[in-house]
C-alpha cells in the first residue's frame, strides 16, 4: 500500500435523503416544506440585477445577519450565518469540540453528528433515550468535551421542555452546548432566550424547513459574541465567500415577511394534528410530534411494507 493511501482520512459518510429525478412525486423523506417561499422572494428575483453576479458577495453577510438579528431581537454580533444549518453545525464542531474528552449526543438523533465527529477526529459517546424516546438530561451531567442535541429531536419529533434544556446547560458551563433547532418553529419554545443568560450555549436554526428555502442553503446560530467571533474566524480560514448573493437577498425577504411565515407554519401544524388523528384511527402509534413529520409505527404492518406501497403510489 502506498503511503498516501494509508494517510487518507476515511469516514463513513452521511447519506442524504433520496432526491427523485422524476416529477410529480409527493416527497416526504427529507421533511421539506410543501408551500413555496414568500411571494417577496419572487419579487426579489424579478428585481435582481444579473450583472451583479460578476461581483463577490459580502463575506460578512451583513444585511442578512442584521435582518435575522432584528427579527429575533438579538444583536448583530450574536448571529452567525452559514450555508445551511449543516454548515453551521460543522463549523461549530470544528471550532469548539477540541477536547480529548468525548462529546455527548443522543444515540437516536441526527446521523450527521457522528460523521462530523469522525471526520474531525473528535471522540464521542452516544447517550441512550428512555423507553419513550425522550432525551434523559441527567445522562449529560457527566464530564465531557461538549454537548449537542436536536430539539425537537429527529427522527423522533419529540420536544424537550426548556427547563430540561437549561438543566443540561447549567451542568456543562465549561463546555459549549449546541441546541439544534431545525424544527423548533413547528412546536415548543426556542432556547434562544438562554443565549443572553449563558455564555456557553449556541442555538442553531435553518431556513430549510419552516421558511421553505431548503434550496437556498441558509442556516444560522445565536450565541455570545465571543463564540460568534470564533466561528467567523474559522469560517474565514476556509472560505470568505460562503453565502452567495441570491441566498442573501432571498433570505432577507423571507425573514421580513413574518405574516406569510406564520401562516405557512400554522397550516403545517394543523395538517400534522389532523394526520395524527387519522393515523391513530388506522392503527398507527407515535410519540407526540412537535416537528413537521411524525415518527410512526403500525401494530400489524411493517415499515418496509408501508414504504414499498407508498413508493408504488409515487410517494
Feature names for model-found ranges:
Residues 1-55, 143:
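N-terminal "arm"/small-domain region of PLP-dependent enzymes with the aminotransferase-like
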Residues 27, 148, 293-295:
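Short aromatic/hydrophobic contact patches that present stacked aromatics
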Residues 177-182:
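Short beta-strand/loop segment that forms part of the nucleotide-sugar
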Residues 29, 223, 295-301, 312-315:
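Conserved PLP-binding active-site segment of the aspartate aminotransferase-like
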Residues 5, 38-42, 61-65, 89, ...:
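A general structural signal for well-ordered alpha-helical segments in protein cores
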Residues 200-280, 284-287:
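PLP-dependent aminotransferase class I/II
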Residues 53-172, 183-198, 202:
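Conserved core of the PLP fold type I
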Residues 269, 281-310:
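Conserved PLP-binding catalytic core of the aspartate aminotransferase-like
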Amino acid at each position: 500500500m502506498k503511503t498516501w493511501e494509508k494517510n487518507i482520512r476515511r469516514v463513513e459518510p452521511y447519506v442524504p435523503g433520496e432526491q427523485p429525478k422524476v416529477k410529480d412525486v409527493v416527497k416526504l423523506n427529507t421533511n421539506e416544506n410543501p408551500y413555496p417561499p414568500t411571494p417577496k422572494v419572487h419579487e426579489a428575483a424579478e428585481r435582481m440585477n444579473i450583472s451583479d453576479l460578476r461581483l463577490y458577495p459580502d463575506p460578512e453577510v451583513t444585511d442578512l445577519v442584521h435582518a435575522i438579528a432584528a427579527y429575533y431581537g438579538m444583536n448583530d454580533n450574536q448571529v452567525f450565518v452559514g450555508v445551511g444549518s449543516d454548515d453551521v453545525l460543522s463549523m461549530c464542531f470544528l471550532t469548539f469540540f477540541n477536547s480529548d474528552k468525548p462529546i455527548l449526543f443522543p444515540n437516536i438523533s441526527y446521523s450527521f453528528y457522528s460523521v462530523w465527529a469522525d471526520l474531525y477526529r473528535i471522540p464521542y459517546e452516544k447517550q441512550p433515550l428512555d423507553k419513550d424516546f425522550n432525551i434523559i438530561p441527567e445522562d449529560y451531567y457527566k464530564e465531557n468535551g461538549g454537548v449537542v442535541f436536536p430539539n425537537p429531536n429527529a427522527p423522533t419529533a419529540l420536544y424537550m421542555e426548556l427547563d430540561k434544556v437549561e438543566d443540561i446547560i447549567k451542568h456543562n458551563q465549561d463546555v459549549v452546548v449546541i441546541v439544534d433547532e431545525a424544527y423548533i418553529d413547528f412546536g415548543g419554545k426556542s432556547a434562544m432566550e438562554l443565549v443572553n443568560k449563558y455564555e456557553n450555549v449556541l442555538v442553531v436554526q435553518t431556513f430549510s424547513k419552516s421558511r421553505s428555502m431548503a434550496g437556498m442553503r441558509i442556516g444560522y446560530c445565536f450565541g455570545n459574541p465571543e463564540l460568534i467571533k470564533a466561528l467567523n474566524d474559522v469560517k474565514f480560514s476556509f472560505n470568505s465567500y460562503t453565502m452567495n448573493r441570491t441566498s442573501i437577498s432571498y433570505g432577507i425577504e423571507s425573514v421580513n415577511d413574518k405574516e406569510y411565515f406564520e401562516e405557512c407554519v400554522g397550516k403545517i401544524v394543523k395538517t400534522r394534528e389532523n394526520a395524527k388523528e387519522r393515523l391513530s384511527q388506522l392503527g398507527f402509534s407515535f410519540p407526540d410530534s412537535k416537528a413537521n413529520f411524525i415518527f410512526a409505527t403500525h401494530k400489524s404492518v411493517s415499515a418496509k411494507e408501508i414504504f414499498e406501497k407508498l413508493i408504488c403510489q409515487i410517494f
